[in-house]
């Protein structure tokens, strides 16, 4: 079927009546203005059907060249118009059979507007000689009066009788006959309706044509042939003589066979006589006496085929004729037409929206390749409330196959169900054998896609189309019933339904106020369950487990009872509400956590929900209110339980030892972080449960904040998404909170394991682990990571209401300062845990689930399932890591996490998706908030703080980084670590608070975040003593944060992408930088970022300056936060990728931030580095430093000494430049070499990771995993140095360096924090070590936790660094310089790209950056 356009030059008609008007719109104006008129016809072989202009503008502007599908029909139409009056138009032209081979005959239905403005029609017989297609003669004029009758003759023809005249017409094909009958019946109906009788005033214009009959006599005789004249067709063959005895039985058989034949034959090239002959051949009998019955049945079948079949409410399946029936299409509400043919044109391009799949109905046709596009097109129609017509030629094979494929994907049906459904509604449906095979293949693809939860078949622009693939707990996100079709989807729906009410609680983070000694722990206790597992991601295992949990109703109680991942499946609110269940949840949550983490990682976009910082703030506040870890102000029992969990931390440490052995065994993995993430997947999940440890009331408050944020107008849409995620969080959090202490332990274990692995691979690792074991703070750090995850989940909720967030931030700013210690650490822990979970989920679904379970037990490390699971997971991880290498494992974790986030992260940067950018912004905002809170922190600290907020774990890493930071600057002096101890503790308390908030946004910091301890007990930047510490801590914290930011930025951004995508949009982010730190809005911490939002709104440069200023002034915290936010926003908005790079560089610059690097960072720190660094250090000192310093005071010296050897030369600069962020590339020398080893593994494993992860998340995941492993660091660092992006990243790396610098500045600016920043540097290095466990210089705090925290910080920092980069382009050169000075920034850079590019690009960038920086960022280099 083709669309042809015919030019007609109106020639004045001598007999045209003045009152006659043109039939088709546009004719009159054409007549009044003598110019060529174009008429459009829908043509098939032997027939042309006039296409009315849709609304004047629909006339297709098609060139008048010959249409290859129209044959000579176009020329014939052109000639016919010469005989017509200008006011008349051709409604139909049908080619008829002719007795003479050299003659072509057409039956033409001509219409015009009559005297009463009614349509009057006549039939003209046109003759063409075979040798001249341009000359036409008229041989017949037959007016259609009201008494016109039409009869089928049974031989493929029909007779028209009117006014005692009978004429026989035999179209050349069934299709042509069908077209002729349609037009004739329509004309006859009009004649009957208006009573056109002979002799009336109607059809007076017939005389014009009667006077123009000019065909030769033979042609006129043929037109006037009598009814009794036999057809020239021969009789049926006399082969079959016996007539069926049972006529009815024969007729039934004829109906069946006739339909089959008509479905198989091209009706344009076959006559009813030939169809009858075919029937006779098949039935082996003569059907001559059934010919009338056959013709009538044929018309019935044609009628059925000619009307589109409504398959779904928004989908019609039809033929080319349906596509050409404008009136019918408009009456049915069709606005979209999917044309699955190569031979049929779009008939009304100006009226309908077309999508063309240009293929033939052949077995060689690859229709499968187009089904993703067709799915999007149909979904687009549905989204806009319109109907879509899917048509091919007959609506039998090509279009039917396309609709079946759509049903399979849209509703999650298998092929049999979809085929039966479509066949039931359109019985002629019959895909050709090749299409059926392709449908079977598509079924497998959809199943696999569902299982690995990737976005292979889901476009980002139309992600809402395949809602069933979205995380089960996506309260705010649209959870379509279709999505729920799959078991995973159903579970998701259940979760959503169950979790929706608890959304506010979801983000609840119970932070059990602990003694001054346990302040860090309090922070850790406030773990945010950020992971919303996309049920579909783990279509198989996770889906089943999750489904079971969801089906259970998996409320907090369910989660508590189940040792799977109830948090993900349970309602956080319930869990939060039920403090008593918290411990149980913690115990059983780990198993679920791992799976959940996997699911979350896979469904990062939808799954990860940033929990509002407000919630984080509440828990933080609570700890300050109740210093005793066992006396949570809101829920003592819960806190007590948390306390118990803290006690259990020792068990975790023993588990840590086990993990150390494992890590040693799987040192080849050289991805301690990767391993930790896998092992810590369970731990991270435990950490998620750790949120439970947070005071229940605090959790409730946080959840309430989350819900309030979600309810805000801005949050309305995003809020819904956030809510869904919050639900997931809710489910996660309630168990999380119950398990918070437990989770902390789990996080500690994970952290420990990670560090131990790193230690196995490097010197600093073991020491770090040792510190962690003695220092319960580390456990809280891990919890912090999880909290950050939870917070991050909250953040998306908050993001919906940017304004609210900003306000909350402002209001919560003071609180942030106050509760920084508690909230931040908790947030950090949660984030890290979540990140770890996400990353863990990424390595391998099955493996991850197993690991998750094992990790969780590990996280519990208590007698029981957790411990056993830990052992099992250790074994599995060991085997898997040995098999794939630690780096690969981490890569797969990151990759999986990115699979959903991937699009968010990678796409977010390019797309400017709100999700990813907002997470970064949020992260950055939080950093500035932390800065504000810590007023004393240097720019570096501000960055750290921001990261802290984002991942509670980040603070601990920052603390480590802080210690390390000074080391690079001042050397690995043990006293720096010791000195930091006290200060760092305080700072950490404050920083983690902000960091938790910040981290909440960048949930993706899986393992790193865990490292952050709840040292953020120094909640108030107002603290005088802690204040100075905070300043120092902020610096060191910022470095740690940077590191964490790097990894976390990648991971978190990914997760946030999902969450933020739902809740925050790039425009919103840029418009409302405050929104970025949704966590702020969510929790009191969010209030603090509010100050930053203002700054954030300011130019990125301002932000950098502000950060610098913030470090200098008591308000630095606020200014830093603001600037960070600004930078973050800028970073996200301008180019998530580039900014990510920047962040990555800064974050991952953990190589050698030596004194020069530190100074360089300092120099760059004010514009770019400052903001980023401040949060980093802040967070570090605040959460990890405070706790660790107090608990690891003695250990700090040892750890520093142990870590100094490695980090001092290599690690120190490493830490200094972007210690935490650089956890990706931990030790400069050893780490580099190890990174190289891991690099191959990570690359390999990345290749083995989920496809979606591989696509975008692969690189990010790889980077993230690499960050974790110090073995990979050396390798990656060189690569990073080489990375061209290094320069871009270097500014961010510089941020890490800047952190050191900021520490120095902070020391200068904030005497209160004399050299805490330096200890932070050490810690940064430690974090680096944690990531690369080998390079943990100051072991004041558990290196493992710091490492994890660092990882979180890195990832988190990355986004922030990116923001900074965006903020002040001028800082870019500085970053480059930093990169030159320290290789570390390069890794950070890589991390940032990781966020941007879905983890693959980041590695490359990191590589370049590392090469440039010559730091130990092997992880990034690996990619």
From Swiss-Prot:
The modification Phosphothreonine is found at residue 1422. The active site is at 392 (phosphocysteine intermediate). The modification Phosphoserine is found at residues 17, 25, 36, 461, 487, 534, 631, 633, 1217. Keywords: Actin-binding, Cell junction, Cytoplasm, Cytoplasmic vesicle, Cytoskeleton, Differentiation, Hydrolase, Phosphoprotein, Protein phosphatase, Spermatogenesis. GO terms for cellular component: acrosomal vesicle; cytoplasm; cytoskeleton; extracellular space; focal adhesion. Pfam families: DEK_C, DSPc, PH_SSH1-like_1st. GO terms for molecular function: actin binding; phosphoprotein phosphatase activity; protein serine/threonine phosphatase activity; protein tyrosine phosphatase activity. It catalyses: O-phospho-L-tyrosyl-[protein] + H2O = L-tyrosyl-[protein] + phosphate; O-phospho-L-seryl-[protein] + H2O = L-seryl-[protein] + phosphate; O-phospho-L-threonyl-[protein] + H2O = L-threonyl-[protein] + phosphate. Residues 307-448 form the Tyrosine-protein phosphatase domain. Residues 248-303 form the DEK-C domain. Its EC number is 3.1.3.16, 3.1.3.48. SMART domains: DSPc. Residues 889-904, 941-953, 1019-1034, 1144-1172 have a biased composition (Polar residues). Residues 664-680, 910-932 have a biased composition (Basic and acidic residues). Residues 9-18 have a biased composition (Low complexity). It is an enzyme of class 3 (hydrolase). Residues 1-37, 617-641, 664-684, 696-728, 797-825, 840-862, 877-954, 962-981, 1019-1041, 1070-1108, 1144-1179 are annotated as: Disordered. Belongs to the protein-tyrosine phosphatase family. Tyrosine phosphatase activity has not been demonstrated for this protein to date. Interacts with filamentous actin. Protein phosphatase which regulates actin filament dynamics. Dephosphorylates and activates the actin binding/depolymerizing factor cofilin, which subsequently binds to actin filaments and stimulates their disassembly. Inhibitory phosphorylation of cofilin is mediated by LIMK1, which may also be dephosphorylated and inactivated by this protein. Required for spermatogenesis. Involved in acrosome biogenesis, probably by regulating cofilin-mediated actin cytoskeleton remodeling during proacrosomal vesicle fusion and/or Golgi to perinuclear vesicle trafficking. This is Protein phosphatase Slingshot homolog 2. The lineage of its organism: Eukaryota, Metazoa, Chordata, Craniata, Vertebrata. The gene is SSH2.
């Amino acid at each position: 079927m083709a669309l042809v356009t015919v030019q007609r030059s109106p020639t004045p008609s001598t007999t045209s009546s003045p009152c006659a008007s043109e039939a088709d719109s546009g004719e009159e104006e054409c007549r009044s203005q003598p110019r060529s008129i174009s008429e459009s016809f829908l043509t098939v072989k032997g027939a042309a059907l006039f296409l009315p202009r849709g609304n004047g503008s629909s006339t297709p502007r098609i060139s008048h060249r010959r249409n290859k599908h129209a044959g000579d029909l176009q020329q014939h139409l052109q000639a016919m118009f010469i005989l017509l009056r200008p006011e008349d138009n051709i409604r139909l032209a049908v080619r008829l059979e002719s007795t003479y081979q050299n003659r072509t005959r057409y039956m033409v239905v001509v219409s015009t507007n009559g005297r009463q403005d009614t349509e009057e029609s006549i039939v003209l017989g046109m003759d063409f000689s075979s040798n001249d297609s341009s000359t036409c003669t008229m041989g017949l004029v037959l007016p259609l009066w009201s008494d016109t009758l039409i009869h089928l003759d049974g031989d493929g023809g029909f007779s028209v009788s009117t006014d005692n005249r009978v004429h026989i017409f035999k179209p050349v094909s069934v299709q042509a006959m069908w077209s002729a009958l349609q037009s004739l019946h329509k004309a006859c109906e009009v004649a009957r309706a208006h009573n056109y009788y002979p002799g009336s005033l109607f059809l007076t214009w017939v005389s014009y044509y009667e006077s123009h009959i000019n065909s030769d006599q033979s042609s006129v005789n043929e037109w006037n042939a009598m009814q009794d004249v036999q057809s020239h067709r021969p009789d049926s063959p006399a082969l079959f003589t016996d007539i069926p005895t049972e006529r009815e039985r024969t007729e039934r058989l004829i109906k069946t066979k006739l339909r089959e034949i008509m479905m198989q034959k091209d009706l344009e090239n076959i006559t009813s006589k030939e169809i009858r002959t075919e029937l006779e051949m098949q039935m082996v009998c003569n059907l001559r006496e059934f010919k009338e019955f056959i013709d009538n049945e044929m018309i019935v079948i044609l009628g059925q085929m000619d009307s589109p079949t409504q398959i779904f409410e928004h989908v019609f399946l039809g033929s080319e004729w349906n596509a050409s029936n404008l009136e019918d299409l408009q009456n049915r509400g069709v606005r979209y037409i999917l044309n699955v043919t190569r031979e049929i044109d779009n008939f009304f391009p100006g009226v309908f929206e077309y999508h063309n799949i240009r293929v033939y109905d052949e077995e060689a046709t690859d229709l499968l390749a187009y089904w993703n596009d067709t799915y999007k097109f149909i979904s687009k129609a549905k989204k806009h409330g319109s109907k879509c017509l899917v048509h091919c030629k007959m609506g039998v094979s090509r279009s039917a196959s396309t609709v079946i494929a759509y049903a399979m994907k849209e509703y999650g049906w298998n092929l049999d169900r979809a085929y039966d459904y479509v066949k039931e509604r359109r019985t002629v449906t019959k895909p050709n054998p090749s299409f059926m095979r392709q449908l079977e293949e598509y079924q497998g693809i959809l199943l696999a896609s569902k299982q690995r939860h990737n976005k292979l078949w889901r476009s980002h622009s139309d992600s809402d189309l395949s809602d069933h693939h979205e995380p089960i707990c996506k309260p705010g996100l649209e959870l379509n019933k279709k999505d729920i079709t799959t078991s995973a989807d159903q579970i998701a729906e259940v979760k959503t339904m169950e979790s929706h009410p608890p959304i506010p609680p979801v983000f609840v983070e119970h932070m059990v106020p602990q003694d001054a000694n346990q302040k860090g722990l309090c922070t850790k206790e406030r773990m945010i369950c950020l992971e919303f597992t996309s049920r579909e991601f783990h279509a198989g295992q996770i889906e089943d487990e999750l489904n079971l949990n969801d089906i259970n109703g998996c409320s907090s109680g369910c989660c508590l009872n189940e040792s799977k991942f109830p948090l993900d499946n349970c309602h956080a609110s319930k869990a939060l509400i039920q403090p008593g269940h918290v411990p149980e949840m913690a115990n059983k949550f780990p198993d679920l956590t791992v799976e959940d983490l996997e699911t979350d990682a896979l469904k990062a976009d939808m799954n990860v929900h940033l929990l509002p910082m407000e919630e984080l703030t509440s828990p933080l506040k609570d700890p300050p209110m109740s210093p005793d870890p066992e006396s949570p102000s809101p829920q003592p029992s819960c806190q007590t339980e948390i306390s118990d969990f803290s006690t259990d931390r020792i068990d975790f440490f023993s588990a840590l030892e086990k993990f150390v052995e494992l890590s040693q065994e799987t040192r080849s993995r050289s991805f301690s972080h990767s391993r930790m993430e896998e092992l810590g997947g369970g731990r991270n999940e435990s950490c998620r449960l750790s949120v439970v440890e947070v005071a229940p009331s605090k959790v409730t408050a946080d959840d309430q904040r989350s819900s309030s944020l979600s309810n805000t107008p801005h949050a309305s849409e995003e809020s819904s998404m956030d809510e869904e995620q919050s639900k997931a969080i809710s489910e996660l959090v309630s168990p999380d909170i119950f398990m918070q202490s437990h989770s902390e332990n789990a996080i500690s274990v994970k952290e420990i394991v990670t560090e131990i692995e790193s230690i196995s691979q490097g010197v600093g690792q073991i020491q770090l682990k040792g510190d962690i074991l003695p220092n319960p703070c580390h456990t809280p750090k891990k919890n912090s990571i999880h909290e950050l995850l939870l917070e991050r989940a909250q953040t998306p909720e908050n993001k919906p209401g940017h304004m609210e967030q900003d306000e909350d931030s402002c209001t919560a700013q003071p609180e942030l300062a106050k509760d920084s210690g508690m909230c931040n650490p908790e947030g950090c822990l949660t984030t890290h845990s979540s990140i770890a979970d996400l990353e863990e989920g990424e390595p391998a679904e099955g493996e991850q689930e197993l690991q998750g379970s094992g990790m969780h037990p590990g996280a519990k490390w208590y007698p029981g399932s957790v411990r056993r699971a830990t052992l099992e997971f250790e074994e599995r991880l060991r085997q898997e890591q040995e098999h794939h290498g630690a780096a690969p494992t981490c890569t797969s974790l990151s990759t999986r996490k990115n699979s959903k986030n991937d699009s968010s992260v990678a796409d977010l940067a390019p797309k400017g998706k709100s999700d990813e950018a907002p997470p970064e912004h949020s992260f950055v905002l939080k950093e500035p908030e932390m800065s504000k809170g810590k007023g004393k922190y240097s720019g570096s600290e501000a960055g750290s703080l921001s990261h802290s907020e984002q991942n509670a774990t980040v603070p601990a890493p920052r603390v480590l980084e802080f210690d390390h930071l000074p080391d690079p600057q001042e050397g690995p002096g043990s006293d720096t670590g010791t000195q930091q101890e006290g200060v760092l503790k305080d700072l950490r308390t404050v920083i983690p608070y902000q960091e938790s908030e910040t981290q909440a946004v960048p949930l993706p910091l899986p393992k790193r975040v865990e490292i952050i301890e709840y040292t953020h007990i120094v909640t108030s930047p107002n603290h005088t003593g802690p204040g100075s510490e905070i300043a120092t801590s902020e610096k060191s914290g910022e470095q740690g944060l940077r590191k964490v930011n790097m990894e976390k930025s990648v991971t978190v951004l990914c997760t946030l992408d999902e969450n933020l995508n739902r809740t925050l949009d790039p425009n919103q982010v840029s418009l409302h930088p405050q929104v970025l730190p949704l966590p702020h809005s969510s929790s009191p911490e969010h209030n603090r970022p509010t100050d930053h939002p203002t700054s954030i709104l300011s130019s990125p440069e301002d932000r950098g300056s502000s950060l610098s200023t913030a470090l200098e002034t008591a308000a630095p915290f606020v200014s830093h936060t603001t600037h960070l936010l600004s930078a973050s926003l800028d970073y996200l908005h301008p180019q998530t990728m580039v900014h990510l790079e920047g962040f990555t560089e800064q974050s991952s610059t953990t190589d050698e931030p030596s004194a020069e690097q530190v100074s360089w960072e300092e120099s760059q720190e004010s514009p770019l580095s400052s903001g980023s660094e401040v949060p980093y250090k802040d967070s570090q000192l605040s959460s990890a430093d405070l706790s660790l310093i107090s608990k690891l005071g003695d250990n700090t010296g040892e750890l520093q000494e142990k870590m100094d050897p490695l980090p001092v030369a290599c690690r120190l600069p490493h830490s200094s430049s972007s210690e935490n962020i650089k956890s990706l590339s931990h030790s400069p020398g050893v780490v580099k070499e190890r990174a190289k080893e891991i690099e191959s593994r990570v690359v390999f494993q990345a290749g083995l990771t989920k496809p979606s992860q591989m696509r975008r998340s692969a690189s990010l995941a790889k980077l993230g995993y690499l960050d974790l492993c110090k073995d990979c660091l050396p390798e990656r660092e060189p690569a990073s140095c080489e990375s061209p992006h290094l320069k871009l990243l270097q500014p961010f790396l510089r941020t890490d360096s800047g952190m050191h610098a900021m520490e120095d500045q902070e020391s200068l600016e904030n005497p209160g924090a004399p050299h805490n920043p330096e200890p932070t540097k050490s810690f940064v290095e430690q974090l680096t070590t944690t990531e690369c466990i080998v390079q943990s210089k100051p072991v004041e705090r558990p290196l493992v936790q710091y490492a994890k925290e660092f990882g979180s910080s890195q990832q988190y920092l990355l986004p922030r660094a990116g923001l900074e980069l965006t903020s002040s382009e001028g800082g870019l050169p500085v970053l480059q310089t930093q990169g030159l000075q320290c290789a570390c920034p390069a890794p950070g850079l890589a991390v940032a790209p990781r966020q941007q590019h879905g983890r693959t690009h980041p590695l490359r960038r990191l590589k370049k950056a590392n090469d440039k920086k010559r730091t130990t960022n092997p992880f990034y280099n690996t990619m």
